[in-house]
UniProtKB/Swiss-Prot annotation:
Name of the featured protein: tRNA (guanine(37)-N(1))-methyltransferase 1
Keyword Nucleus (UniProt): yes
Residues annotated for S-adenosyl-L-methionine binding in this entry: H207, D245, L246, D273, A274, N380
Pfam families in the record: TRM5-TYW2_MTfase, TYW2_N_2
Primary location group: mitochondrion
């Protein structure tokens, strides 16, 4: 691809041959006059004698008489040992130089050097601009060489995202072909196949920002859950999560990650269209039929569930009897230690705090009733989530609902030519009702004239389905 030797730079330097036991003292005297370059040791082995070492002098020392070094320091050195000045060469090769330095040498003048890339486990996603595509293989080789073994696969996006699952097409430019990897975020671990599911490492802080708004015992509905970057942290806080995604591969990895992070008893996984998903949660008769086996088994029984130990046998029977792609992983369990108030809304108790301590906790096994209360709804599909706000119109039945209506967290893109008022108008058009006290949070810039925002608001009571 290219000759690595062409990047070699040979430095002609001077060095002092010093007895090995005196090198430490000599280096103190020569402070400021020794070679000071990243990853190059100024004291090295002497190839001619095991009892001595070579103290490499800086490039500023040009002459063998060491005239650039103050006489006072030279006199101190002479008291330590007889001065023996020898020529020494240092070759800075391909392995020494940074990726940025090498690419500046390789790429034509005027092209922007790719200074960063997204890291997904062992995978580096370059996302090269069109003008860099003719040099994609060279760029990939340099980045691979300079980041291995932390990075084992280099990929680049091919074309635009056009499929319904928001998953780009990639080509592997260097390294292994394996696209399955593992990502860590704030105490959670996620397994995924980067070629099959959507993942954006740059949203890590947003995942935790939103999760920090949730309280233990709350119920969260994640309409575009992916592999669980919002659902898993929410469950780790002791929330009960209804998580949905249209992509079957995302759902498969969501289930894997729920179990991997030991929160599968707090996440109910669905694989369906987002509108149908929310309608399904609000359909009283359908949910009652699905959960009848739980009700018949024991409506109020408490089971002590150990994090890594045995589970109650009846709980296992419930888990098996309700297992399907549109059923909860954990047999429709409600949040750990949740108690009911007079209005039926779940409140915190100490057993939920125990969930975070990863020890023993108490888990209630009553019928889950999402049509009665949900605290938060997450809509992380910024390209089209606003259009899905019609999912909430005339679906929640007023006669069954208890407590405040949910907070909606809807992600969207706002271009430089657009205003928040324009986005509110678009949201109200889809919702068909006025939104009170909307809050915008800027997540990140995605392009020079385009930013990602989170619009949060309380669902208007006008959206409720009135009693007939």
């Amino acid at each position: 691809m290219f000759d690595e030797s062409k990047f070699d730079v040979n430095l002609k330097l001077w060095a002092l041959r010093i007895p090995r036991e005196l090198c430490k003292s000599a280096s103190r005297i020569l402070n400021g006059y020794m070679l000071n370059m990243p990853r190059i040791k100024p004291i090295t082995e002497d190839p001619t004698c095991e009892k001595t070492r070579l103290v490499i002098l800086s490039e500023s020392v040009k002459n063998a008489d060491l005239s650039e070094i103050p006489e006072e320091k030279l006199n101190q050195l002479k008291k330590l040992s007889e001065l023996e000045v020898v020529p020494h060469s240092v070759t800075l090769g391909y392995s020494y130089w940074s990726a940025d330095h090498l690419l500046k040498q390789i790429l034509p003048d005027g092209l922007d050097i790719p200074s960063s890339f997204e890291t997904i486990g062992h995978i580096a996603h370059l996302n090269l601009h069109d003008e860099l595509l003719p040099f994609k293989d060279v760029i990939a080789k340099v980045i691979y060489d300079k980041n291995y073994p932390r990075i084992k696969t280099i990929v680049n996006k091919v074309g635009t995202i056009s499929n319904e699952f928001r998953v780009p097409k990639f080509e592997v430019l260097a390294g292994e072909n394996g696209m399955e990897t593992e990502v860590k975020q704030y105490g959670a671990r996620f397994k995924l196949d980067y070629g099959l599911v959507y993942w954006n490492s740059r949203l890590e802080h947003e995942h935790m920002r939103l999760s920090s708004l949730f309280k233990p015992g709350e119920t969260v509905c994640d309409m575009f859950a992916g592999i669980g970057p919002f659902a898993i942290p929410a469950a780790q806080k002791g929330c009960f999560v209804y998580a949905n995604d249209l992509n079957p591969d995302s759902v498969r990895y969501l289930k894997i990650n729920a179990k991997f992070n030991k929160v599968d008893d707090l996440i109910c996984v669905h694989n369906m269209d987002a509108r149908k998903f929310f309608s399904h949660l609000m359909a009283v008769s359908t949910c009652e039929d699905n959960l009848q086996s739980v009700a018949d088994n024991d409506k109020t029984k408490e089971a002590a569930v150990s994090r890594g130990g045995e589970t109650n046998s009846s709980g296992e029977e419930i888990r098996e009897s309700n297992a399907s792609i549109n059923e909860p992983l954990g047999a429709n369990k409600k949040p750990s230690g949740t108690t009911k108030t007079e209005n039926g809304v779940g409140k915190d108790c100490k057993s939920i705090e125990g969930h975070a301590n990863k020890r023993l906790r108490q888990t209630l096994l009553p019928i889950a009733k999402p049509w009665e209360h949900i605290d938060h709804v997450i809509m992380n599909l910024p390209a089209s989530a606003l259009q899905f706000l019609d999912s909430f119109s005339n679906v929640i039945q007023k006669k069954y609902w208890k407590g405040p209506l949910p907070l909606i967290h809807c992600y969207c893109f706002i271009r430089a030519s657009e205003t928040t008022e324009f986005i509110i108008a678009e949201a109200e058009t889809a919702l068909k009702f006025h939104i009170e006290d909307p809050v915008f949070h800027k997540v990140r810039d995605v392009a020079p004239n385009k930013a990602m925002f989170c619009l949060s608001f309380r669902l208007p009571e006008a959206c409720l389905k009135q009693e007939e």
